[in-house]
Swiss-Prot record:
Reactions this protein catalyses: L-glutamyl-tRNA(Gln) + L-glutamine + ATP + H2O = L-glutaminyl-tRNA(Gln) + L-glutamate + ADP + phosphate + H(+)
InterPro entries from the UniProt entry: Amidase, Amidase_CS, Amidase_dom, AS_sf, GatA
Family stated for the protein in its record: Belongs to the amidase family. GatA subfamily.
Subunit and partners: Heterotrimer of A, B and C subunits.
GO CC annotation: glutamyl-tRNA(Gln) amidotransferase complex
Active site: 79, 154, 178
Reported function: Allows the formation of correctly charged Gln-tRNA(Gln) through the transamidation of misacylated Glu-tRNA(Gln) in organisms which lack glutaminyl-tRNA synthetase. The reaction takes place in the presence of glutamine and ATP through an activated gamma-phospho-Glu-tRNA(Gln).
Molecular function via GO: ATP binding; glutaminyl-tRNA synthase (glutamine-hydrolyzing) activity
Lineage: Bacteria, Bacillati, Bacillota, Clostridia, Eubacteriales
Name of this chain's protein: Glutamyl-tRNA(Gln) amidotransferase subunit A
Entry-linked HAMAP family: GatA
Coiled coil segments of this chain: none
GO biological process: translation
Organism: Clostridium botulinum (strain Hall / ATCC 3502 / NCTC 13319 / Type A)
Length: 485
């Protein structure tokens, strides 16, 4: 039996029944990483010795018949912008090359408390800015379904690790679609939770009012399991909400009778690949046949979401990334005349093109004379978009759309076409702007490439997402697909 192909809940059952040891599982994944990651590029750092040590500790507890915790013995990969004590945290940027985390992020602490085995740090677009993971300063991540195609981004390594059987579970971050879009491209399940549901403490900030940590797994049950572990109040992050975290496993039922689902026409317009549309429409029919009430709806301000997003996120990025200056830590230029020269050259040499592009845009929209015309106006648009969603959720329990307008595109295809790259997130960005939760799960295959279905619900209604996603998933077999790599 290939342990790397199994889900977290399948591995948990085997560990509980003493059919396998945690060390066996861990070594199987480490062997897999050593075998395939030179081609897939999911990992930027692998913690082999520490992972085996933790696995042996868990086996000792199992031998003593101690009760297993939620993630005992389950291999997890962590995006390289989330702090793990003693491991690198580079954000896939030269400016942080060689930086080691002195502490754990809150989500990392929670995973360790539940005895998850952290295998290492995962590849990403530099500082989480990108939609293809081509912006990594260190290596290219490739889609396990087709090595000539991108895995999506910015959490491309997180999706590749799960789809390529290099981790059972992974964590990514989602600012404008960076968990959902790569989940769609790689055929795995990925959740962007409600803003404030999961702590950002110990996560390197890109857009502070947009960033959220999100789980990825092979199926909905795995995604719900990891969400239950990492969700909840964190006193170190004042944006987290003191709201009880439900037992998401109870949401995993096939009963969706009477659930009201809206189909927003704005998500099915020009630019949507006809075969992606067909796959999503087939998925909607399945939900309807299973008892959901499906009706059309409208979110008329969605056309403005992408513009508002890039103004707000770039403004926040220009502020957040000001701390990387070549003085305290990270990359420092070797050729400088004075302190000003250190700042200028370290940042110019340390940041990649996309990061510099967004810093410049953000600085521009925050500057005197343009603040009112761009940034302030974008905040007003954001409020109207939130109102749009609230209006729709008075009538519907959830809305359904494609996750991305296309399947995974070829490596290099959009690298020099910035607008085309940005448009690959056109269906995920509005959800991030509003701060509501959404999940992506596979709903079809086109020419050997996965298609993603996005389900969106109201604030803190992740249980509704898991219910609908699980119902659909159990009616089809797309979650059982494994990349033959």
């Amino acid at each position: 039996m290939d342990l790397t192909k199994l889900t977290a809940h399948e591995l948990k059952d085997m560990l509980s029944n003493k059919e396998v040891k945690a060390e066996e599982i861990t070594k199987a994944f480490l062997d897999r990483i050593n075998l395939v990651d030179n081609k897939l590029g999911a990992y930027l750092y692998v913690s082999e010795e520490e992972a085996i040590k933790k696995a042996k500790e868990i086996d000792g507890k199992i031998e003593k018949n101690e009760e297993l915790k939620a993630l005992s013995g389950i291999p997890v990969g962590i995006k390289d912008n989330i702090n793990v004590k003693g491991m690198q945290n580079t954000c896939a940027s030269k400016i942080l090359e060689g930086y080691t985390s002195p502490y754990d992020a809150h989500v990392t602490e929670k995973i360790k408390q539940e005895e998850g085995i952290i295998l290492g740090k995962l590849n990403m677009d530099e500082f989480a800015m990108g939609s293809s993971t081509e912006n990594s300063a260190f290596k290219l991540a490739k889609n396990p379904w087709d090595l000539e195609r991108v895995p999506g981004g910015s959490s491309g390594g997180s999706a590749v690790a799960v789809a390529g059987s290099e981790a059972t579970l992974s964590l990514g971050t989602d600012t404008g679609g960076s968990v959902r879009q790569p989940a769609s491209f790689c055929g795995v399940v990925g959740l962007k939770p409600t803003y404030g549901r999961i702590s950002r403490s110990g996560v390197v900030a890109f857009g502070s009012t947009l960033d959220q940590v999100g789980p990825m797994g092979k199926d909905v049950e795995d995604c719900a399991l990891l969400t239950s572990v990492i969700a909840g109040l964190d006193k170190k992050d004042f944006t987290t909400v003191d709201k009880e975290v439900p037992d998401y496993k109870k949401s995993l039922t096939k009963d969706i009778k009477g659930k009201r689902i809206g189909i927003p026409k704005e998500f099915f317009g020009d630019g949507l690949d006809k075969n992606v549309r067909k796959s999503v429409e087939e998925a909607i029919k399945v939900l309807e046949a299973n008892g959901a009430e499906v009706k059309p709806c409208s979110l008329p301000l969605m056309d403005y979401a992408l513009s508002a997003y890039y103004i707000i996120s770039s403004a926040e990025a220009s502020s957040n990334l000001a701390r990387f200056d070549g003085i305290r830590y990270g990359y420092r230029s070797k050729n400088f005349k004075d302190a000003k020269d250190i700042y200028l050259k370290s940042r110019s040499e340390g940041f990649g093109d996309e990061v510099k592009r967004r810093i410049m845009l953000g600085t521009y929209v925050l500057s005197a004379g343009y603040y009112d015309a761009y940034y302030k106006k974008a905040l007003k648009v954001r409020k109207l978009i939130k109102d749009d969603f609230q209006r729709v959720f008075k009538e519907f329990d959830a809305i359904v759309s494609p996750t991305s307008p296309t399947t995974a595109f070829k490596v290099g295809e959009k690298k020099d076409d910035v607008m085309s790259m940005y448009l690959s997130d056109i269906y995920t960005v509005p959800i991030s702007v509003a701060g509501v939760p959404a999940i992506s799960l596979p709903c079809g295959m086109i020419d050997g490439l996965p298609v993603g279905l996005q389900i969106i619900s109201d604030y803190f209604k992740e249980d509704v997402l898991f219910n609908l996603a699980y119902n659909y998933e159990q009616s089809v077999d797309f979650h059982k697909m494994r990349a033959d790599f």
